Amino acid sequence: MPSYTLHYFNHRGRAEICRMLFAAAGVQYNDRRIESSEWNGMRNQMPCNMMPMLELDNRTQIPQSMAMARYLAREFGYHGKSNMEMARVDFISDCFYDIMDDYMRMYQDGNCRMMFQRSRDMNSSSESRMRFQETCRRILPFMERTLDMHSGGSKFFMGDQMTMADMMCYCALENPLMEESSMLSSYPKLMSLRNRVMSHPKMCNYLKKRCRTDF
């Protein structure tokens, strides 16, 4: 097995799905958290000048959070067994990534704690919030129905086994639920799924011990 180094800021953000996959698989890795004071000096070392980035054996670099997550999910057995199962895990994961991406854009627009602020007009925060809310209205009902297709929604998206899709449901909705605890009130199966992910023995241990960050 290669040695892994995960490069990202000291946030959950777009790297958290990879951390959850490492935890679920019980695989050790170097969780390199970059401080803002370091970033400008090392930006050019990163593919596309962006993070997160997954490094294997100190030589192979994989950028783009979902490409990284899919690689790890395949390596660790959390990506489905057949091509059709993997396609299902992928579209579910991508749907939740859309929610997470819009939330992070909204957070960046509206929260001065964000490390990098874009120039913006006075309406950008409300516009990004409207986009996030519309994305949730579009995706969450579909995810509730998709979950219901396996065992009436009483297990995981792929049935008995937890996959990357279930972990994406957890991490994409974590911060939004902190802000609006009732956002899943119309989606009880998704809420129960998040509780099952939290209760998974390795996930439970990881969530208790991980670094505490704002997002």
Swiss-Prot record:
<comment type="function">
    <text>S-crystallins are structural components of squids and octopi eye lens. Contains relatively little if any GST activity.</text>
</comment>
<dbReference type="InterPro" id="IPR004045">
    <property type="entry name" value="Glutathione_S-Trfase_N"/>
</dbReference>
<dbReference type="InterPro" id="IPR036282">
    <property type="entry name" value="Glutathione-S-Trfase_C_sf"/>
</dbReference>
<dbReference type="GO" id="GO:0004364">
    <property type="term" value="F:glutathione transferase activity"/>
</dbReference>
<protein>
    <recommendedName>
        <fullName>S-crystallin 3</fullName>
    </recommendedName>
</protein>
<comment type="similarity">
    <text>Belongs to the GST superfamily.</text>
</comment>
<dbReference type="InterPro" id="IPR036249">
    <property type="entry name" value="Thioredoxin-like_sf"/>
</dbReference>
<feature type="domain" description="GST N-terminal">
    <location>
        <begin position="2"/>
        <end position="80"/>
    </location>
</feature>
<feature type="domain" description="GST C-terminal">
    <location>
        <begin position="82"/>
        <end position="215"/>
    </location>
</feature>
<dbReference type="InterPro" id="IPR004046">
    <property type="entry name" value="GST_C"/>
</dbReference>
<dbReference type="Pfam" id="PF14497">
    <property type="entry name" value="GST_C_3"/>
</dbReference>
<dbReference type="Pfam" id="PF02798">
    <property type="entry name" value="GST_N"/>
</dbReference>
<keyword id="KW-0273">Eye lens protein</keyword>
<dbReference type="InterPro" id="IPR010987">
    <property type="entry name" value="Glutathione-S-Trfase_C-like"/>
</dbReference>
<dbReference type="InterPro" id="IPR003083">
    <property type="entry name" value="S-crystallin"/>
</dbReference>
<dbReference type="InterPro" id="IPR050213">
    <property type="entry name" value="GST_superfamily"/>
</dbReference>
<dbReference type="GO" id="GO:0006749">
    <property type="term" value="P:glutathione metabolic process"/>
</dbReference>
<dbReference type="GO" id="GO:0005212">
    <property type="term" value="F:structural constituent of eye lens"/>
</dbReference>
